[in-house]
Amino acid sequence: MEATQADTIRKGPISRFLESLKIIQFMLFPNRTNPAALYDLLSTTNNLAEESLYLNLGYWKDASTYDQACQAMAAAVGDFADLTDAPLQVLDAGCGFGDQDEFWQRHYNNCAFTAMNICASQIAKARQRFPNSKVTYVEGSATAMEFPDNHFDRVIALESAFHFNTREDFFKEAYRVLKPGGILCLADVVGKDVELNWKMRIALYLGQGLWQAPKANDYSWSVYQNKLSANGFDGIETEDISPHVFLPFKRYANQRVLDPEVNSRINPILRKLWTMPHGGFEPSSYLLIKAVKKNQ
């Protein structure tokens, strides 16, 4: 039976204190290469979802709840990746607790989905939640994959590539494991070519620390596009969906943390972060990105 937020175990005061110290450590110290530790900390407790265990920012164009928005994001990425009912081999790099993969498997039943995550606890939880799943859940690194060359028709990274150490190393691995003509599709947070004021710089520093985003991944779309091209991809397409992501998410989060059930289980530091002004997202765009592996 699928686990939901209703099954979440509340943390005691000692666990909560240690968790708070870890959050502060993430934000203030420059080691930004351990996303598994971050997601172990987030676990199923520090999550805004109503029933699911989604962890993305959501696509809020027609959504009113977090679960709806996150599923809409999964649907948008599936469409942008040209998923079809054909028997495609699909890799999801950074699968979280598996919600998006189960959604895709239901809608593209003939595809074979492999869901990979560096966070062992999330893979274990996904297997527990979906014991009869057709999705194959694998623990592993997106920058050092244990898959053969030319194996997948699609490689997807839904709001995960900014964690990878580095994103460009992931591009290289995605190119290797994709078949010629295969598609790499990302939903990613990409820096803008803008001058940052001191408030933006502080917010960016703390945000990169909290979300374990390596400094090497902090670059604009022009650099991003060049890195894709340099690693063998062409046919690059983008869609900027920022207006339907950042501000609507923050508005929802501001209200969501007022719910007594959510308030009781989310770490107080994270509650404060969810209610902070929108400014932390100002130097970034939220892009859907698609690139094709050149035929060899």
Residue ranges and their predicted role:
Residues 12, 237-296:
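Conserved Class I S-adenosyl-L-methionine
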Residues 168-183:
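A short glycine-rich, Lys/Arg-flanked "PGG" loop and its adjoining helix->strand segment in the class I
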